């Protein structure tokens, strides 16, 4: 089982592994990514994808309009060779600017030949090479089936986002795996509910590692209650994230949680 999973916390090693697997691909490369930067690393991936297209490999690419931009010029060489490139939720202006532009696709998923997948926190970017990230290389058939289905859902409905889109909300199950398809919601996010339930049932230890820690009322309540039950509770975060505003706001929550233990 363990040989089916490999964890990366170094982006350079991650990208080297991704590029190596893409180079060996025989059938398809699917990429769903928030930010595909037009920098040295982005060009390296684009160049390799172009080579694979010329070999007859299927390439599908879904990028987010906020993270990557809505202009497809950078991807034109791929499109000309037959790649399917889609932009998730192009930016809306006017009255819809604040109402809809927060609905982003922040996923980072790469699937190669339907046999290998990468999922985690890293974008395709040279900018984040020195960041501490967490990504997993997967060769588990059950989990790959879930990830393929999730990618197909996103790729098919890239311009039809809706709060009422049931397909975007469902949990995908396979064996012991549960994959929660979540998305920005002004009412409630299923992943938050899942976290709260897991924390409320914790008996010995809770470890949270995140760059942005802004827990809502319910999550703060469950964390404090866990400490009171004797659960060893640890939150790991950077002293300074790349979003200064978040660093300022989180001080309030850290004070409350620190006092609780």
Show where each model-derived region lies:
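Charged, low-complexity intrinsically disordered terminal segments
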Residues: 1-87, 92-261
């Amino acid at each position: 089982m363990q040989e089916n999973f490999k964890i990366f916390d170094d982006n350079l090693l991650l990208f080297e592994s991704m590029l190596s697997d893409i180079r060996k691909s025989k059938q398809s490369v699917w990429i769903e990514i928030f930010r595909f930067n037009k920098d040295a690393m982005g060009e390296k991936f684009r160049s390799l994808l172009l080579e694979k297209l010329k070999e007859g490999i299927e390439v599908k690419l879904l990028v987010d309009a906020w993270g990557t931009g809505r202009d497809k010029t950078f991807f034109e060489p791929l499109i000309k060779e037959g790649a399917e490139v889609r932009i998730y939720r192009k930016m809306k202006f006017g009255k819809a600017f604040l109402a809809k532009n927060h609905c982003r696709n922040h996923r980072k998923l790469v699937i190669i030949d339907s046999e290998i997948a990468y999922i985690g926190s890293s974008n395709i970017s040279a900018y984040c090479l020195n960041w501490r990230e967490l990504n997993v290389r997967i060769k588990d058939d059950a989990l790959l089936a879930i990830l393929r289905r999730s990618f197909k859902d996103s790729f098919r409905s890239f311009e039809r986002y809706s709060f009422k889109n049931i397909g975007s909300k469902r949990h995908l199950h396979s064996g012991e795996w549960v994959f929660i398809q979540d998305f920005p919601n002004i009412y409630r996010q299923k992943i938050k509910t899942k976290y709260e339930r897991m924390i409320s049932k914790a008996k010995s230890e809770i470890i949270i590692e995140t760059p942005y820690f802004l827990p809502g009322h319910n999550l703060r309540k469950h964390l404090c209650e866990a400490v009171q039950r004797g659960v060893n509770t640890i939150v790991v975060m950077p002293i300074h994230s790349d979003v200064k505003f978040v660093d300022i706001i989180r001080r309030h929550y850290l004070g409350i949680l620190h006092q609780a233990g």
